[in-house]
Amino acid sequence: MEAKAIGKTIRIAPRKVRLVVDLIRGKNVKEAQAILMFTPRGASPVIAKVLDSAIANRTHNLNLNLENLFVKEVWANESITMKRMLPRAKGSGHLIRKRTSHITVVVAERE
């Protein structure tokens, strides 16, 4: 049985989130939490929060322990992009894209 948690519209670019997400895919839950705790990236605490939510969904809704729990799937998709203008010379402007992410974590029990 699987449990899923989704973090929506996280204010970090998906390209940066995917660097951290690739580290925990397929790992045991405890090992994934340790990796996220010691990874010096801005996306690490956010992914850890979504992972904790998926674990809580699994233990609360299905009344199971987390001994054999592992990260089955994890991915980061692009969300909305906020657009801002930066004034430049001669009355022109450059577009600044502030990208956001949807982070999905699926945990399952290893057989």
From Swiss-Prot:
Keywords: Ribonucleoprotein, Ribosomal protein, RNA-binding, rRNA-binding. CDD domains: Ribosomal_L22. The gene is rplV. One of its GO terms (biological process) is translation. Belongs to the universal ribosomal protein uL22 family. GO terms for cellular component: cytosolic large ribosomal subunit. One of its GO terms (molecular function) is rRNA binding. This protein binds specifically to 23S rRNA; its binding is stimulated by other ribosomal proteins, e.g. L4, L17, and L20. It is important during the early stages of 50S assembly. It makes multiple contacts with different domains of the 23S rRNA in the assembled 50S subunit and ribosome. Part of the 50S ribosomal subunit. InterPro entries: Ribosomal_uL22, Ribosomal_uL22_bac/chlpt-type, Ribosomal_uL22_bac/org-type, Ribosomal_uL22_CS, Ribosomal_uL22_sf. The keyword Hydrolase does not apply. The keyword DNA-binding does not apply. Pfam families: Ribosomal_L22. This is Large ribosomal subunit protein uL22.
